[in-house]
Amino acid sequence: MPALSLQQLQLINFRSYKCLTWDCRPGLNIIFGPNAAGKTNLLEAIGYLALARSFRQQQDQQLLTWGASSFQVRGLCHSNGEKIELVINYQQHNKRLTINGNRNRLIELLGIFPVIYFGPDDLHLLKGGPAYRRHFLDREISMGDRLYCRNLQDYRRILFQRNLLLRAIKAGRGKEGELEPWDIQLLATGKAICEKRSCFLQSLAPRVAATYRDMAGGEELALIYRPGVASQEEWAERLKVGREREVQAGMTLWGPHRDDFTFTLDGHEARYFASQGQQRAIVLALKLAEARYYRELLHVMPVLLLDDVFSELDEAHQGALLELLAGADQAFLTTTEVGLLPARLIQRSHLWELARGREPRLTSGPVEAQ
């Protein structure tokens, strides 16, 4: 299987980094330093190369260094035997992508440099609201499917225009008959989104269940898709009979923008009945399964980004994560204290010390390489 790795990361005015050039190493990389040193910011920048979007923030404006009006993220990657330069520039709500010096649409970035991120906030996949889980679905599916990303963009545009019209009708500036062409577009695009989400979760579900079973034993974990509407026919009917409700609400009340998914343990909702340790294990099982799914789909192992996760896992769950790391071409892990990590992980890793706003400093390499 071809290897995937990031060879060099350059940042200008990104988060706490005014200017950074970091020559990364293949294999395992442990980034250690005190809180607020910028460890998570580095992972965020690496993840930005996958989708031109942050896994922490919805607004690119929030990624700017204080006082700056633009930022740049540049990555020199090695993928499928080729060297690829990815450069993303942001200024005044506009993004520009160049690949090997050529201007490209942002959607062309998808699938070139896939990553899997695992951090403390991922517990929101169980504890948070449906919007958080939809954001996860959209981000992860888009990474391997450009058509899904296009459909999602179209759906959001159609939804926005339809909601404007609903509010105009409520204010007496529009007629209900004007909704019909928007309904047709909404149904067609929404169908494609729902079908892909269902397919993705159906592919992931048995992998997640098997991974959790290996880690936790007897409990049966299920991953269940809960679409905003049961079928296309039901959705079309609701749009017709529920128009008055939608006009009064000034928004579209049914569709994939109301989708959700859930986890159950032995038939019980995990978000309510699972312990904190079980919830961490569920999220870990999801991430492990996702990495293996993308390895099969894209024929390359995604780069793994692990943000201070080992301290929250027991020995059995650490073992499952170490097994995944053993098969990774490249992984980046953060911690405040190297001594908190398993010794066998430290021995196989490059250790990078980080101080706020500075470039990581290599302090040691894998034992095998010395």
From Swiss-Prot:
GO terms for biological process: DNA replication; DNA synthesis involved in DNA repair; double-strand break repair; SOS response. It is found in: Cytoplasm. One of its GO terms (cellular component) is cytoplasm. ATP binds at G33, P34, N35, A36, A37, G38, K39, T40. InterPro entries: DNA-binding_RecF, DNA-binding_RecF_CS, P-loop_NTPase, RecF/RecN/SMC_N, RecF_2. Pfam families: SMC_N (PF02463). Coiled coil: none annotated. It comes from the Bacteria. Keywords: ATP-binding, Cytoplasm, DNA damage, DNA repair, DNA replication, DNA-binding, Nucleotide-binding, SOS response. One of its GO terms (molecular function) is single-stranded DNA binding. PANTHER family: DNA REPLICATION AND REPAIR PROTEIN RECF. Belongs to the RecF family. The RecF protein is involved in DNA metabolism; it is required for DNA replication and normal SOS inducibility. RecF binds preferentially to single-stranded, linear DNA. It also seems to bind ATP. HAMAP family: RecF. This is DNA replication and repair protein RecF. The gene is recF.
